[in-house]
UniProtKB/Swiss-Prot annotation:
Belongs to the phospholipase A2 family. Group II subfamily. D49 sub-subfamily. It comes from Macrovipera lebetinus (Levantine viper). Its cofactor is Ca(2+). GO terms for biological process: arachidonate secretion; lipid catabolic process; negative regulation of T cell proliferation; phospholipid metabolic process. The lineage of its organism: Eukaryota, Metazoa, Chordata, Craniata, Vertebrata. It is an enzyme of class 3 (hydrolase). Expressed by the venom gland. Ca(2+) binds at Y43, G45, G47, D64. Pfam families: Phospholip_A2_1 (PF00068). This is Acidic phospholipase A2 1. Its main location: secreted. Binds 1 Ca(2+) ion. It catalyses: a 1,2-diacyl-sn-glycero-3-phosphocholine + H2O = a 1-acyl-sn-glycero-3-phosphocholine + a fatty acid + H(+).
Length: 138
């Protein structure tokens, strides 16, 4: 399933807030955003199950939970407005749904930046088949 998602992202040119989320990650981590995290651990990328493998994976778990609480728009396809001011990400939408999506992405990007020391290459390209522990609740 995750393979299909990454192919879809490549084919559609990373539209909507996925590219915006990637931009936020780039600014907060200095990494190549989405592609540094797309297959990381049990929760970074499409879907997720099991126990987050480390603090970086937990950022993705919390992000998934946040997206799950958004009502009124599709978080992965919505385009919102945001800016960078003095190194901070500022969400600027009046639409409550778009603002919520932006806040989910903002918090995750900050979380990635704060937890870069936990990023472990052994969790890159991690298979969901290895995520066997019981899933946590949001």
């Amino acid at each position: 399933m995750r393979t299909l998602w990454i192919v879809a992202v490549w084919l559609m040119g990373v539209e909507g807030d996925l590219s915006q989320f990637g931009d936020m990650i780039n600014k907060k981590t200095g990494t190549f955003g989405l592609f540094s995290y797309i297959y990381y651990g049990c929760y970074c990328g499409w879907g997720g199950k099991g126990k987050p493998q480390d603090a970086t994976d937990r950022c993705c778990f919390v992000h998934d939970c946040c997206y799950g609480s958004v009502n009124g728009c599709d978080p992965k396809l919505s385009t919102y407005s945001y800016s960078f001011q003095n190194g901070d990400i500022v969400c600027g939408d009046d639409d409550p749904c778009l603002r919520a999506v932006c806040e989910c992405d903002r918090v995750a990007a900050i979380c990635f930046g704060e937890n870069m020391n936990t990023y472990d290459k052994k969790y890159m390209l991690y298979s969901l088949f290895d995520c066997k522990e019981e899933s946590e609740k949001c």
